[in-house]
């Protein structure tokens, strides 16, 4: 991945633009037929390449807060924030404090609903991603248990959206989080979530199952 990373990200960026043009353009059928044939050939070529195995676990060393970050094996490949994943808008997340992070994203026109706004499912996924980043930096191998998003107004496409997420409290193996979603015009949504700490061993089992399926072509 390290050697091909820049070109993977370039490919993903091109595919994002393709998705927007595929939705917004209105050309003759021949244009789309030609594009489809070209892409189908590209897919055939990529399917001949080896499958990429993912690795999870704690990273070496500690950060400035004395924590060991947990790597979910999704660097660059997350469907929400991965620069090498064409499905990602992508969301960019920065750490502010030990238990707080901020995400920014500009949703493309390809996620526009019939009313012209961003599909709320994308906003909810972005909130979940910000929470996951906070907990990964805290060294917590977690899974989402409950994600409750209350929308206050529609979310615009092609405008910067800011998501602030933080840990409200921890109790045993459960972490409670909150978030606020805003655009220039004001608040878009408020969110609360409950995460369960599942541990590194459980994530290792998930990793093994996932990699076996990749090898089998599932």
Regions found by a protein language model. Name each.
Residues 101-103, 147, 163, 177, ...:
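Hydrophobic residues positioned within well-ordered beta-strands of beta-sheet architectures
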Residues 94-96, 166-170:
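Short beta-strand micro-motifs enriched in acidic
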Residues 34-111:
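Long amphipathic N-terminal alpha/beta scaffold segment
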Residues 107-121:
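Short histidine-centered catalytic/ligand-binding loop motif
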Residues 1-67, 155-157, 168-218:
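HotDog/MaoC-like acyl-thioester-processing domains
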Residues 96-100, 118-142:
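Active-site helix/loop of acyl-thioester processing domains in fatty-acid/polyketide metabolism
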Residues 1-2, 29, 130-162, 167:
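Hydrophobic beta-strand-centered segment that forms part of the acyl-chain substrate-binding groove
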């Amino acid at each position: 991945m390290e050697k091909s990373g820049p070109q993977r990200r370039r490919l993903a960026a091109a595919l994002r633009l393709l998705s927007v043009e595929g939705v917004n353009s209105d050309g003759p059928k021949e244009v789309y037929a030609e594009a489809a044939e070209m892409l189908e050939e590209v897919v055939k070529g990529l399917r001949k390449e080896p499958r990429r195995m993912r690795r999870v676990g704690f990273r070496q060393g500690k950060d400035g807060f004395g924590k060991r970050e947990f790597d979910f094996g999704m660097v660059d490949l997350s469907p929400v924030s991965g620069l090498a994943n064409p499905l990602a808008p992508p969301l960019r997340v920065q750490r502010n404090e030990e238990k707080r992070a901020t995400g920014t994203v500009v949703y493309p026109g390809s996620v526009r609903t019939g009313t012209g706004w961003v599909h709320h499912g994308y906003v909810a996924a972005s909130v979940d991603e910000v929470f996951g980043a906070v907990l990964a930096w805290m060294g917590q191998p977690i899974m989402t248990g409950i994600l409750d998003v209350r929308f206050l107004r529609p979310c615009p496409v092609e405008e910067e959206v800011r998501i602030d997420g933080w840990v409200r409290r921890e109790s045993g193996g459960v972490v409670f989080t909150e978030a606020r979603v805003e655009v220039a015009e004001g608040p878009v949504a408020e969110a609360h979530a409950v995460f369960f700490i599942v541990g590194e061993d459980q994530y290792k089992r998930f990793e093994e199952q996932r990699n076996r399926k990749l090898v089998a072509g599932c």
